[in-house]
Amino acid sequence: MQNYLNFQSGSSRTDASSGELGGKLPPQCVSDGRGMNYFFLILVLNSLLSVPTAFANRKTAVGHNKDEGLAKEFLERYNKEFSQLVNERARASWNYQTNLTDYNAAIVEEVSARVSAYGDTANSNASSFDTTLFTYDTHRLLTKVGSLSLDPEEMKELTQVLHQMSRIYGNHKVCKEEKCYSLEPELTKLMASSTNATERLWAWQQWHEGVGRAIRPLYVKYVHLKNKQARLNGYEDYGDEWRQNYETKELESLVQDLYKQVEPLYRQLHAYVRRRLYETYGPSVIDLKGPLPAHLVGDMWGRFWSDLGDIVRPYPNKPSVDPTPAMIAQNYTVCRMFDMGNEFLVSMGLKPVPDTFFNLSMLEKPTDREVVCHATAWDFSDGKDFRIRMCTSVSFSDFLTIHHELGHIQYGMQYAHLPYGYRDGANDGFHEAIGELMAMSVATTKHLQSVGLLDVMEDDPEVDINFLMQQALSTVSTLPFHLVQDTWRWKLFRGEIPTDEWNQAYWLEKMATVGVAPPVPRDDPQDLDPVAIFHVSGDFDMIRYFTRTIMQFQFAQALCDISDHVGPLYKCDFYNSTKAGTALAKMLSMGSSKPWPDAMEALTGQREMSVLPLLNYFRPLHEWLEKENARNGETLGWNIPPSG
């Protein structure tokens, strides 16, 4: 995941004071743990500091100063001074998220106040110019300068609310029989491997009620303060500010139209998965005409269904494309996994990670303090310091995540030469799509065979269906999930749902769109289940993950065409293709200097998001699902339970 002021990484160390720490890494990784987290923390930091994301099409007042030379001098000074402030803020935030102490939180609060004050002044100065006759870049950069902040007391309150939500999420443990479990790694492993419905329900309920109930009162304050801040800057509400990242007023209808085109594939996948869960858990748990129980669909949140692979594999007697056993047998280490990710990018002629990367990143979970484990990439805004924070384990899932996060960092390194206002992806979905693009190529059988993680085998349509099923569990299944996470929040920000009905409204929308229901009643007014996922409590929009899933297939199609791939898209690997790397670098180096359709056109020749590459990629699986579901007489869709 990308965070737009800095990125974040997995295992870092920092003492209770101000020193930066990293993770415990093997000697060959040369890490003493003194590093920042690179989750593309721009988003988190922007949230804390009321600095707009670089993509925002903020409404600004028209001034009277028509001197473009003076405007350019102002922008040059702003670029230098604000980059330095952002770097300082990134360091403070890194230290806090890799060591969740009150001391480190106080430092973030102090730096945030200075950044907010600078942003207010810079915004006022930028607004003094009449840009009507200015050149394109001067005009566009001025619209990205600073933003208006809440008053100091409210800004302090917002910063504290965000820190408290982060700390609750990062520190929460669930306990049973005097033993306590963290989300990473214990609960995550349980949800990935357990087929005990009772055990899974316990973990799901304890996590959602423990985190959701603690964060709920803070989230009410958060919605109020973020809305107030957004309106100060000319937006209708905070959801409007998020959507303007795409520089269009039509995003809501656009994403709904895109999903309608993919929905038939999703419903086929849903029906098939429901049948396999029925065979695993029985009729007392699974209704063959109803929604899926939330605690049984993959991870803690039902976001990724990848961990259902063994249950739903179409041809269980044929190989699955999960080389985790091979990685373990070959004594893979965290360091080796990151080295291979870096080498993948270099093979395309792209930039290697900086020499400081392994020293400064947190790549494994430390044992001596509480940290935020969610994998993130960080850009420290100095053009040199890029890091990852990740509590990595030796698994294929984490191997793919590494390539995803390194994709974020590659994007940041490619646009590091641009003025600060342009140092961002063309839109939020672009950044995420680039990360997934790398993981897509790495997951192919061709690539895994080339790096010795999969035995060479003859083409087998049944193995292909197994592969496509696994891919669908981590892409197609996420589309309605990510859509609902934000359509629900957009309604919150617009004030369309009474506060005491937030949770019920979420589950009604989720049941209707995703076909997933809570496993136990969720009508307690204390509950707020959506905030129990990192992105919601961490102030990240999630429509970026919806748009990225659409765009990653468009980008993959373009790169595969450029690299002269012959055959279906799902067999394409652009490893070692410098032609693909050159084309990709051209788009990445644009940053947000142009509207996103321009960036997309530079790589794909298209100016709109299209689901056709995704549908073409999964066409063999879609056809197989239609036949299999018809054979079993499956109901496509689901009945909403009366209690819903």
Each model region followed by its residue ranges:
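Ligand-binding pocket scaffold of soluble enzyme catalytic domains
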Residues: 392
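Active-site-proximal, well-structured secondary-structure segments within enzyme catalytic domains
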Residues: 179-193, 199-202, 220-389, 456-477, ...
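Conserved catalytic alpha/beta cores of large enzymes that bind or transform nucleotide phosphates
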Residues: 432-458, 468-469
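Inter-helical turn/loop segments and adjacent helix faces that build the functional surface
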Residues: 240-245, 249-253, 272, 276, ...
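Classical eukaryotic N-terminal signal peptides for Sec-dependent ER targeting/secretion
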Residues: 1-44
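Post-HEXXH active-site segment of zinc metalloproteases
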Residues: 412-437
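N-terminal helix-rich structural modules
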Residues: 45-48, 55-221, 239, 248, ...
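C-terminal, non-catalytic "cap/extension" segments appended to globular domains
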Residues: 62-71, 102-103, 137, 237, ...
